[in-house]
Regions:
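Cytosolic, membrane-interface loops and tails of multi-pass inner-membrane proteins
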Residues: 20-44, 251-283, 334-355
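Extracellular/periplasmic helix-loop-helix junctions in multi-pass membrane proteins
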Residues: 66, 301-314, 493-497, 546
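Juxtamembrane "helix exit" motif at the C-terminal ends of alpha-helical transmembrane segments
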Residues: 60, 297-306, 378-389, 540-541
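"…together with the soluble PPM/PP2C metallo-phosphatase catalytic core" -> "…together
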Residues: 1-249, 364-381, 394-408, 414-436, ...
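Loop-to-transmembrane boundary segments
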Residues: 277-289, 352-374
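Charged, amphipathic alpha-helical linkers/stalks
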Residues: 317-368
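Membrane-interface capping segments at transmembrane-helix boundaries
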Residues: 20-24, 324-340, 517-523, 543-545
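C-terminal membrane module of polytopic membrane proteins
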Residues: 273, 277-338
């Protein structure tokens, strides 16, 4: 469960850092201006990398302080972060960026002693360090640039990376390697915090500081997973786990080289551009790419023990089918009909009548507004014990909530919102881990509250939230992660407590989000509940006999 603490802290740090960076962006020159090649039409700050990188690294350094590989990874990540900030502010040349990438990768390969020693199709062959290290540097730089170049639409690169990281975290769980799990979940947390600001239309872009760090993290995790942590798995798994970005960058480079163009000149021939040209909306394009990426990473998990030949053949079959379909559609002039491609289903008449009833319309929101605070308090009051470290953190957060309330901050402010998420996660963790003497009853009551909250959220989001709350591609990622956890748990490979905790946390996060979008007062019930929950947890954790 420590991994999910790492993820929760990463989410909170990311969500708190990005608004600060957003205010500094114009002064630092970190603003992405629109041009004919880009999809956005207004200036957008390029500071998402602050939340992704710092939000991911801080929890990892706290949990794995003495690990040599993590030290090298953290140092390399900070180097890429520094070079990325430079590029986000000044638009440096590709050669300067390569210098930063080589420095970061070199640290991991030589100081962290991480390199490829076994390759697909040659199980008995062990590469010497003289060959394995240069090959690893080349491969990691390639992955960094593949993710960097896939960052073309709101939530695209971050979402693709998250899908890969979810699969890597699960494979790390199967291998029993805490570092793989921690690194993957921390980066998922930092990315989730960023996605809060990057769903279409984006308020923040990740910039090079974020995209290079994501590529670096994915590359390091894949090498470590297949070369050290999980050597019984196929050595070809990185193909499926990286998925679409690696094929996309190779296809784009081929088109540039065959067309006599500059290798590094940005063009509009990535997969997402081609889908947009075929009439797909932004939402449809991102969800389509997410779906392909999800299929590939699920394939990696299911085929982890299959032969390298089968894994590689599956990858190339999926990729070849995708590019063949795109090419045929483009040559035939096919366009998606927007009238027939709407993803919104018509509502049944009976449901519409219920949704139009003023009294019934207010009921789901009332349930959400009551159950979320009640669950928070239930978590602090009903559990058997609260660890002292929880008590210390809760006390600090209680002081932060009180300060924010006295300063006039509503639940919708970014700092308050992040604190609410952490409080909800604390309550969920405590109920799952320390249910108390009446454990079965406590769990059933918590399950009932989460079920009622999920039902109210489903009704509210689907039928009653035309203006204030809408589903986004990020919801696809959340649904994918939740379904994956449930399916893996049902197959006997997952941990029941982990699935329960994540389910609780996700439903509570959506509840906090719905309430926060509609709260104007600092004295709202949710704020008071968070303050009371954290205060009780602090007192019970620091003074168990009180």
């Amino acid at each position: 469960m420590n991994g999910f603490f790492v993820m929760t802290l990463a989410v909170a740090l990311s969500m708190m850092l990005i608004p600060v960076a957003q205010r500094l962006a114009p002064k630092l020159g970190m603003v992405d201006m629109p041009d004919p090649r880009k999809v956005h039409s207004v200036p957008v700050p390029r500071v998402g990398g602050w939340g992704i990188t710092i939000g991911s690294l801080v929890p990892l350094v706290l949990v794995f302080p003495g690990d040599p590989l993590l030290q090298s990874f953290a140092a390399g990540g900070l180097i890429l972060f520094a070079f990325g900030l430079w590029d986000d502010a000044k638009q440096v040349s590709h050669w300067i960026k390569f210098v930063g990438q080589l420095l970061a990768v070199g640290l991991v390969v030589y100081h962290g002693d991480l390199y490829v020693s076994r390759i697909p199709f040659a199980d008995s062959l062990v590469l010497s360090p003289a060959i394995g290290r240069p090959f690893t540097i080349f491969a990691l730089v390639g992955v960094i640039n593949a993710i960097n170049h896939s960052d073309g639409l709101d939530g695209l690169a971050s979402g693709e990376s998250m899908l890969s990281l979810i699969a890597i975290a699960f494979l790390g769980y199967l291998s029993g390697n805490a570092l793989v799990i921690g690194m993957a979940l921390a980066t998922i947390g930092g990315t989730l915090g960023f996605l809060r600001y990057n769903t279409h239309p984006a308020r923040v872009f990740m910039g090079d500081a974020g995209s290079q760090f994501l590529g670096f993290t994915l590359g390091v995790l894949l090498v470590y997973l297949t070369q050290a942590a999980y050597t019984t798995a196929s050595a070809a798994l990185p193909l499926l786990l990286l998925g679409l970005p690696i094929a996309d960058i190779i296809a784009v480079l081929y088109q540039r080289i065959s067309g006599g163009m500059n290798w590094f000149k940005a063009t509009r021939n990535h997969v997402h551009h081609r889908l947009l040209f075929l009439g797909f909306s932004h939402f449809q394009t991102v969800v389509t790419i997410y779906s392909i990426q999800a299929a590939l990473v699920v394939g990696a998990v299911l085929m982890r023990y299959q032969s390298d030949y089968l894994v590689t053949a599956t990858y190339f079959l999926v990729i070849a089918s995708l590019f063949a379909t795109l090419t045929i559609a483009e040559r035939r002039g096919w366009k998606l009909d927007p009238q027939r491609s709407s993803m919104q289903l018509p509502l049944p008449t009976a449901v519409r009548r219920l949704a139009d009833n003023p009294k019934l319309r207010s009921l789901p929101l009332l349930i959400i507004s009551a159950v979320v605070p009640l669950f928070m308090l239930f978590g602090a009051l009903s559990v058997e014990a609260i660890p002292s470290d929880f008590g210390a953190v809760a006390s600090v957060l209680a002081a932060l909530v009180l300060t924010q309330m006295l300063r006039g901050r509503a639940a919708g402010s970014m700092i308050m919102r992040a604190t609410l998420y952490v409080t909800a996660a604390f309550s969920a963790y405590l109920l799952v881990t320390y249910p108390g003497m009446a454990g079965a009853f406590t769990q059933k009551l918590a399950d009932t509250m989460v079920f009622v909250l999920a039902a109210a959220l489903g009704i509210f989001i689907r039928f009653l939230s035309e203006r204030k709350f809408s589903t986004t591609p990020t919801d696809f990622l959340v649904a994918f992660g939740l379904v994956a956890l449930v399916l893996f748990n049902r197959s006997g490979t997952g941990a029941n407590a982990t699935t329960q905790f994540v389910t609780y946390a996700i439903v509570l996060f959506y509840g906090c989000e719905v309430i926060s979008e509609r709260v104007a007062s600092r004295w709202h019930l949710l704020n008071w509940a968070a303050l009371a929950t954290l205060t009780i947890a602090g007192v019970r954790g620091l003074w168990p006999g009180a």
